[in-house]
């Protein structure tokens, strides 16, 4: 352990407290024996390809020629039998041939596109300055036609209620809407006149002259008076 401040540097064993004796550890129980692993079957090692040097290559190639078989250089062995069109002196004949590609069916000819009609270019609107505007406006007035300021040209004929100086652009004609069934005319509620004291006295005198009752709510004369009505009744 580290020295304490009261330890002497030259006396290492002095004043060290005695360590208490460790109690005896109980005996550990014995571990159960592990079951033996079953023996694994031996793995068959893949056969290693023989080393194919030039000497081995020539030897195997001659044997393949004698057997009329193709020489497989990658495996350094004889492969399938030669075909009649194989070359005997071709060193690369041991490559496996690619299967012939099936011939592609001919594509059907595309139908010719119908010639598109030439697009008519929209007529450009003439430049409508003040001078041009006045010129067309005078001509339209002479022809009794309305002046279309947007197109800077004369439009439809004027109607009797058109103003001579009207030069607003014509609105495009809207498609006619289907006629709606005629609705019965709604009777507008009569507006009650303003019935102040002056109006009240005026209408009341007129009702008395006509021998009719005065309707104060509507500020007008109502039905004729009956004999039992009071002269001063103003309901």
UniProtKB/Swiss-Prot annotation:
One of its GO terms (cellular component) is extracellular region. Salivary gland. It is found in: Secreted. Residues 1-133, 155-201 are annotated as: Disordered. Keywords: Repeat, Secreted. Its main location: secreted. Residues 16-85, 95-133, 168-201 have a biased composition (Basic and acidic residues). The keyword DNA damage does not apply. Used by the larvae to construct a supramolecular structure, the larval tube. This is Balbiani ring protein 6. It comes from Chironomus tentans.
């Amino acid at each position: 352990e580290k020295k304490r401040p009261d330890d002497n540097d030259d006396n290492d064993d002095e004043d060290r407290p005695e360590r208490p004796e460790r109690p005896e550890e109980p005996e550990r129980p014995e571990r159960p024996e592990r079951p033996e692993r079953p023996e694994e079957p031996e793995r068959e090692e893949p056969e290693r390809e023989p080393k194919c040097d030039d000497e081995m290559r020539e030897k195997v190639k001659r044997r393949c020629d004698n057997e009329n078989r193709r020489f497989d250089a990658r495996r350094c062995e004889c492969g399938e039998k030669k075909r009649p069109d194989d070359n005997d002196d071709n060193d690369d004949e041991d490559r496996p041939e690619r299967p012939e590609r099936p011939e592609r069916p001919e594509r059907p000819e595309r139908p010719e596109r119908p010639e598109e009609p030439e697009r008519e270019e929209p007529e450009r609107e003439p430049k409508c300055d003040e001078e041009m505007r006045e010129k067309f406006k005078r001509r339209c007035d002479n022809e009794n036609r309305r002046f279309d300021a947007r197109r800077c040209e004369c439009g439809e004929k004027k109607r009797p209620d058109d103003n001579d100086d009207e030069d607003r652009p014509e609105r495009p004609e809207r498609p006619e809407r289907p006629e709606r069934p005629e609705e019965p005319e709604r009777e507008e509620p009569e507006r009650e006149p303003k019935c102040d004291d002056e109006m009240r006295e005026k209408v009341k005198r007129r009702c008395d002259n006509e021998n009719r009752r005065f309707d104060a709510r509507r500020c007008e004369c109502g039905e004729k008076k009956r004999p039992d009505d009071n002269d001063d009744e103003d309901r």
